UniProtKB/Swiss-Prot annotation:
BP-aspect Gene Ontology terms: intracellular protein transmembrane transport; protein targeting; protein transport by the Sec complex
Membrane topology per record: Multi-pass membrane protein
Superkingdom assignment: Bacteria
Key word Manganese present: no
Organism: Borreliella burgdorferi (strain ATCC 35210 / DSM 4680 / CIP 102532 / B31)
Gene Ontology cellular-component terms listed: plasma membrane
Keyword Disulfide bond tagged: no
Protein name as it appears in the record: Protein translocase subunit SecF
Recorded GO MF terms: protein-transporting ATPase activity
Length: 299
């Protein structure tokens, strides 16, 4: 007979520890770092797409040229149909952006590249994004995450009950706040990759939670002689091996990406690994105890 662990009794302690870590992380972020490290995707910037008539130039070569000149710089390779050319998107972050600054940056970049590679340089596209537009992108990203929460609430309410939906949402809120605190404490640059990581974590954590909730729902119908507390603990025990195995295999796969990559992909994999750990324990120790408290109160 499978051993049944009383997971619910640990719920309050786990929630308190998580809440303290999140609170300390947020305080540290705003009072020590002065806020978050917003990446170029969400900052005022100059963007220049260009082509160099020379093959096999690497991103790091471009970064080494301009890192002493520009404090915040991002370089990405663009696929070129011409194998004799190398194409790049170069973004320079600045607090003050206008047409004159864009012209100055473009001239500096072209001059330096011609001097370094002794090749023809063609500007494919160039533009600047001011602070008002970058602020709009931040707000839209926040609304994107909130919209995801609303869709999750509707989906789980239709599939299960409102109590299940609220427990899932609160559990995911915990996961996101934990990740947000983690990003702030370690000064990880928040860019489009990190937003994708957060949305992926939401989906992963939700999947873990739904697996447990689905078993709880089935056992409520089947184990009619048991209290809901017993049903909850039995259900978590029955799905625990699957939950842990899925988390471990996912973590190992993402860890390999973290080891063998650099830049934004490395940050993405780091955040996702933290999300896997947090999402796993929150689905067991936070979502289920919350459901226990809500089950009799909300149908």
């Amino acid at each position: 007979m499978q051993r049944v662990i009383n997971f619910s009794k640990y719920g309050s302690n786990v929630l308190i520890v998580s809440a303290v870590l999140i609170l300390v992380g947020l305080i540290y972020t705003f009072f020590y770092h002065g806020g978050y490290n917003w990446g170029i995707d969400f900052s005022s910037r100059v963007n220049i797409n260009l082509s160099i008539e020379k093959s096999n130039i690497k991103e790091n070569e471009i970064k080494k040229i301009f890192s002493p000149i520009y404090k915040t710089l991002d370089v990405n390779s663009i696929f070129s149909p011409d194998q004799n050319k190398s194409e790049f998107s170069i973004m320079v972050k600045s607090d003050v952006i206008d047409y004159a600054f864009k012209t100055e940056v473009q001239k500096t970049i072209l001059d330096k590249l011609k001097e370094t590679f002794d090749a023809n340089i063609e500007v494919l596209d160039s533009y600047f994004i001011d602070s008002s537009f970058s602020s709009t992108l931040r707000i839209r990203s926040i609304f994107l995450v909130l919209g995801t929460f609303i869709l999750i609430l509707i989906y789980i309410t239709l599939r299960f009950k409102l109590s299940y939906a609220i427990a899932s949402i609160l559990s995911i809120f915990h996961d996101i706040f934990f990740i947000v605190a983690f990003l702030g404490v370690f000064r990880i640059e928040i860019n489009s990759y990190i937003i994708v990581a957060i949305l992926t974590i939401i989906g992963y954590s939700l999947n873990d939670t739904i697996i447990i909730f689905d078993r709880i729902r089935d056992n409520v119908k089947r184990l009619t002689d048991n209290t809901f507390l017993n049903v909850l603990n039995i259900s978590i025990s029955q799905t625990l091996s699957r939950t842990v195995l899925t988390s471990v295999t996912t973590f190992v796969a993402v860890f390999s990406i973290y080891v063998f990559t650099e830049g934004s992909i490395k940050d993405f994999s780091l955040v996702f690994m933290v999300g896997v750990i947090v999402g796993t324990y929150s689905s067991v120790f936070i979502a289920s105890p919350i459901l226990l408290n809500l089950y009799k109160k909300i149908k």
